[in-house]
Amino acid sequence: MLRKLQPNAVLNVCGPDVRWCGNEAGHCRKAEWSVVPAELRDAERTASKSQQADDGEFSRKIDSQDEDIGSREVIRNARELVWYPSEVDTSIRTGWFYHPEEDTDVRTADELRDIYLDAVGANASLLLNIPPDTHGRIAAPDCASLAELGAKIRQIFASNVTEKAAIAADSAIAQHPITQAVDGMADTYWQAAYGQESDTITLKFQKPQKVSCVVLGEHLPTGQRIESGEIWADGSKASEFTVVGHKRICRFAPVDVLTLTIKITASRTEPTLRLLEVYQ
C-alpha cells in the first residue's frame, strides 16, 4: 500500500530502501558503504538470526551495529549484494517527544553542525527528529538552534574557490575528463583511465587561497568505488578520508595554498567523481 499511495517514500529500518546506521546518537561509521551483503536487509527485519553453515558465507552475522559492514573482506563471501545506504537518525532533544522540562537541554547549533557534517559528509542521509510541542508548534529553543545551524552550514559553504584553480588529473577516459567533476552538472563525471585503481587530482591557484574544506561526490549510477584518499596542501597532508559515495565533506585547519592535491589511494575499480568543490 505504501508503494501504491506514496511511490517516492523511503522506507527505513524495517524497510528495503535505507538502513539504520546502528545508533541513535547521530554517529556513523568511519567507512559507510552503501553496498552491503543482502543478509543485512533481512537482519533489519529479523530480531534473531541463526548460523546456517560453518563456511565463509554464514560464519559471520551482519547487523546494523557492526562497525564494518561493507569492506572487501566482509562482502567477499556474500551470496548477494544490495544497495542499502545508511540513514543517521537522532533527535534535537534528549528524547523523541516534546517535554517542557527539556527546553534547556536542546542540542546546540555546534552539536547539530557536527552531526550534519559527520553524517551527510560521510555518505549517509540525516533524519533529525524535531518534536512539536503540546500546541503542535516547534518550541522556541529548537527553532533558535535550527536557525543558528542553518547559518553555520551556509557559512561553511559560502566561499567556493574551485573555479579559481586550474585542475588536472593524472588520468581520465576521453568521455569523462576531470573538468566534468567541477562543471556543476549532476549527470557528468570524471573517470580515471581503465585499469587505474588510484589517481591524483591537482588544483593549482594563481595566488594563495585560504582553504579549509573539500567536498567530493562519486557518480553513483556507476557504483560506489573509492575506498580511501588523502588531501595535500603544498606538499603537506591536510586530511585523510575513507569512502566517498554520495558525498564526503573533508574539513581541516585553514591553510593558504597554491597547489591542492587530492590523492585517491584505493578504489574497487576506476574511481569516478561527479562533484569536487573547494571552500575557504
Regions found by a protein language model. Give the residues of each.
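Long, charged, low-complexity intrinsically disordered regions
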Residues: 237-238, 280
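Short proline/glycine-enriched turn/loop motifs at strand-loop junctions of beta-rich domains
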Residues: 208-209, 224-226
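Extended extracellular/luminal ectodomain segments enriched in beta-structured repeat modules
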Residues: 198, 206-213, 257-258
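Mature catalytic domains of secreted/periplasmic carbohydrate-active enzymes
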Residues: 1-197, 203, 215-217, 224, ...
